Design a protein with these regions (language model features):
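Predominantly cytoplasmic-facing regulatory/coupling regions of multi-pass membrane proteins
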Residues: 1-92, 150, 156-265, 298, ...
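Extended non-transmembrane interhelical loops and adjacent amphipathic helices
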Residues: 88-119, 202
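Membrane-embedded alpha-helical segments of transport systems
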Residues: 93, 97-101, 126-148, 296-311
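Transmembrane alpha-helix interface/packing and boundary motifs in multi-pass membrane proteins
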Residues: 94-103, 258-273, 277
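Re-entrant/interfacial helical elements at transmembrane boundaries that shape
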Residues: 105-116, 270-285
Length: 329
């Protein structure tokens, strides 16, 4: 039986699988609620002093501004004509889509808005968004790797797993940053999959992907801005933890939290919900932190750090949708 006969069955199966996978995170989240106890979680939420919430919100604002600056710096290096303020608004919209999609894949909605606002090609916009997200992911993996060293005596397998993923990502990044190697990959693996009549168009698309691509020297500044973004995010989360008088050194807590963020990127949960909380509860048991406290720290940090800016991004989308005659952000 030919592949074409199986194709509808395979596509139907994949559609069902894609719909089901994000539910896994929700199931984990509900299980944690029941296992820990809803009353304990509510009690922990209500015990957070308001001043610590305001400090966390302030750090979130600084983080979003710096994230915008990082993305804008990359855009400038790519000769993309767009203002920092527009990047800021696009980033808020990305936060909205991140919070409602598995593996934060919604952040790539920025491809559409960058193209629309700067009138560049889809390929160049794709590279811009991919590079911004790749820098973020590499930094997060590096910080998570450091965190895994802090708990190596308890869970050495976490270090080995993160190290393997980190090395694969770095090798891919270094490989694809060079146009010749990127062309070779497309010609060897991807181009043969397409009909002969459209292969010339594919060649042109690959060329546009590398149009004005920043050099390694160009991404040093965005890298360090991105590093400061993740450090501030860690401080934001620790602010909530400090409100509970969690007896963990700040460095240890922040770097261990990064591991839970990496786990939250698995495509089995919407916005990392459930997976992130479950992993952090598991890891902080080493330090004797009550599960209800850890659950609230993680969830509250997610609400302030992602849901809140995502809510503002959602309002921007509504304003754009219902504003007559306004095509731009």
């Amino acid at each position: 039986m030919k592949f074409q006969n199986y194709k509808p069955i395979i596509i139907n199966f994949l559609h069902k699988l894609i719909k089901f996978i994000p539910i896994a995170g929700i199931i984990i989240f509900i299980y944690l609620l029941i296992d820990i106890g809803i009353e304990k979680i509510i009690e922990a939420f209500l015990s957070i002093p308001i001043i610590f919430l305001f400090i966390a919100i302030f750090l979130m604002i600084i983080r979003v501004i710096l994230s915008s600056l990082k993305w804008w710096t990359i855009s400038i290096k790519q000769k993309i004509d767009i203002s920092l303020f527009k990047i800021f608004k696009i980033l808020l919209i990305c936060f909205f889509y991140e919070s409602i999609t598995p593996a934060s894949i919604g952040s790539f909605i920025g491809i559409y808005y960058i193209k629309k606002e700067s009138k560049i090609s889809w390929q160049k916009s794709f590279t811009n968004s991919l590079l911004d997200n790749a820098i973020d992911f590499i930094i997060l993996m590096l910080l998570g790797l450091i965190g895994s060293l802090l708990i190596f005596n308890y869970y050495p397998e976490i270090f080995y797993m993160l190290f393997l993923i980190f090395m694969i990502i770095i090798i891919l990044f270094l490989f694809l940053m060079k146009e010749k190697r990127g062309n070779w990959l497309f010609n060897f693996l991807i181009k043969p999959l397409f009909p002969l009549k459209i292969r010339d168009k594919i060649d042109k698309s690959v060329e546009l992907l590398y149009e004005d691509l920043p050099t390694f020297q160009d991404i040093i500044l965005p890298f360090f801005i991105g590093l400061s973004v993740w450090i501030i995010f860690g401080l934001q989360v620790y602010t909530i933890a400090y409100a509970f008088s969690v007896n963990i050194p700040i460095i240890s807590f922040i770097f261990i939290y990064y591991i839970s963020l990496i786990a939250g990127l698995l495509p089995i949960s919407v916005g990392g919900l459930g997976v992130r909380e479950g992993v952090l509860v598991f890891l902080l048991l080493i330090f004797g932190v009550p599960p209800a406290t850890t659950f609230v720290i993680s969830l509250c940090s997610h609400i302030i750090g992602n849901i809140f800016p995502g809510f503002i991004g959602g309002l921007l989308l509504i304003r754009k949708t219902y504003s007559i005659g306004k095509n731009n952000l």
